[in-house]
Amino acid sequence: MDGKKCSVWMFLPLVFTLFTSAGLWIVYFIAVEDDKILPLNSAARKSGAKHAPYISFAGDDPPASCVFSQVMNMAAFLALVVAVLRFIQLKPKVLNPWLNISGLAALCLASFGMTLLGNFQLTNDEEIHNVGTSLTFGFGTLTCWIQAALTLKVNIKNEGRRAGIPRVILSAVITLCVVLYFILMAQDIHMYAARVQWGLVMCFLAYFGTLAVEFRHYRYEIVCSEYQENFLSFSESLSEASEYQTDQV
């Protein structure tokens, strides 16, 4: 990969992945240090520990809950930005827009779920927290499959297979983790369920980090223009639009 030919926007998905994963592990270590949860490598519950090391339990009590809320809010914002930029990136390249629109909607709903589970702690409002968890995991998984399909279909810079196959594999692993997580939860095997949950979240974050592959080819700009009180005619509008129409935003 030639760094001189890479857009700075490639770092956005990487920052999202690294920031969120680091923040969640900080929450985990704070909760373990305060003896709120068991360490992930514990074989059995020890005296004084309250819960299995689920992420929701790790971020349930201050000071860990304060960090958890901030991490999830920032993650939701970055995920929303990634969703919009990815939609714009693929918009001129797909013939049938429904799949691209579905990918945008799914990731937006997953981002909204992140804010719910981050700001409504489990013991304070379990119902809303669980709704946020369902939105995040459910629409997050759907997003992964949609983006994997779009990657193979659009084939940006002939890198569709190189980026798409790992995404299909990650999507399958994520789906398997979601199913396994709920099975273990139903059987009250909480230590293993918590480990699966952490693995699931790390796979999610790794998946979105792979979007840097396509983002490195694109440059995004925000264009600000002065409001014109007198509207241009239709022909003038088309003429002006043709001057600025590019594949870049």
From Swiss-Prot:
Keywords carried by this UniProt record: Cell membrane, Lysosome, Membrane, Transmembrane, Transmembrane helix
GO cellular component term, pick one: lysosomal membrane
GO molecular function: mechanosensitive monoatomic cation channel activity
Cytoplasmic side: 1-9, 86-97, 152-168, 214-249
Outcome recorded upon mutating G48F: Does not affect ion selectivity
Keyword Cell membrane belongs to the record: yes
Signal peptide coordinates: none
Topological relation to the membrane, as annotated: Multi-pass membrane protein
Locations listed in the record: Cell membrane; Lysosome membrane
Outcome after substituting H51D: Affects ion selectivity
Extracellular topological segments: 31-64, 119-130, 190-192
Annotated transmembrane regions: 10-30, 65-85, 98-118, 131-151, 169-189, 193-213
Catalysed reactions listed for this entry: Ca(2+)(in) = Ca(2+)(out); Na(+)(in) = Na(+)(out); K(+)(in) = K(+)(out); Mg(2+)(in) = Mg(2+)(out)
Record note on disruption phenotype: Deficient mice exhibit loss of coordinated movements and abnormal gait.
GO biological process, one term: cellular response to mechanical stimulus
Tissue distribution of the protein: High expression in the epididymis, pancreas, dorsal-root ganglion, eye, brain, and spinal cord. Expressed in muscle spindle afferents (at protein level).
Recorded family membership: Belongs to the DRAM/TMEM150 family.
Matching PANTHER family: FASTING-INDUCIBLE INTEGRAL MEMBRANE PROTEIN TM6P1-RELATED, TRANSMEMBRANE PROTEIN 150C
Misc. remarks from the entry: Tentonin comes from the Greek 'tentono' meaning to stretch.
Function statement: Nonselective cationic channel with high permeability to Ca(2+). Component of a mechanosensitive cation channel. Confers mechanically activated (MA) currents with slow inactivation kinetics. May contribute to proprioception.
Protein name as it appears in the record: Transmembrane protein 150C
